[in-house]
């Protein structure tokens, strides 16, 4: 009987240990922001001669995207430059502040007419088309896109996409 009791106690403790395991498994994060083919936590260097590069960020949430805020910090994409093309330095892709801003974001390819970001569980932030433009300013940067995602359960995550053109002279 004692042997069975000890066995049962050990089984319970083992089960409890496994069930309450506190590992940092990134697969269970409620919000993820990851570079496609690159580490978003490191500077993305654009080294092609024509300043082209695929710069796509994958964004996913379990509960649906509530906000996808983008803040631009760049030595060349100043507030004046961005205002000239009707783009603020900070905007919410899931909730554009106006129809005019939504149309501007669609025109830049940051939004789609056919796919809403708010409520979706995954989307991409693709700035590939802007790399030749940024490289054309002949300022290596850094050019930062601060991405903040909030899901419908209130979970938040921010990551900074930093782009640099090492072949350009300051």
Language-model-detected regions and their locations in the chain:
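Bacterial N-terminal signal peptides that target proteins for export
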Residues: 1-7
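Short secondary-structure boundary micro-motifs
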Residues: 2, 23, 131-133
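Bacterial Sec-dependent N-terminal signal peptides
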Residues: 5, 13-41
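First exposed extracellular module after export/assembly in secreted or surface-exposed proteins
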Residues: 29-170
